[in-house]
Swiss-Prot record:
GO terms for cellular component: extracellular region; nematocyst. It comes from Bunodosoma caissarum. It is found in: Secreted; Nematocyst. This is Toxin Bcs III 15.09. One of its GO terms (molecular function) is toxin activity. InterPro entries: EGF-like_dom (IPR000742). It comes from the Eukaryota. Disulfide bonds join C6-C21, C15-C32, C34-C43. Keywords: Disulfide bond, EGF-like domain, Nematocyst, Secreted, Toxin.
Length: 45
């Protein structure tokens, strides 16, 4: 489950370094799809 696009504050502020925020509603979790070269929960590494 790749989730859905994040909305509101999460859409713009959750992921770092150009990552794409995704929301998994069934888990209430947010995660990021990171651009190449970045890793970490919020693409911070």
């Amino acid at each position: 489950d790749q989730g859905t696009a994040c909305t509101g504050e999460h859409a713009h502020n959750f992921c770092l370094n150009g990552g794409t925020c995704r929301h998994i509603q069934s888990l209430g979790e947010y995660y990021c799809i990171c651009p190449e070269g970045y890793t970490g929960h919020r693409c911070e590494k």
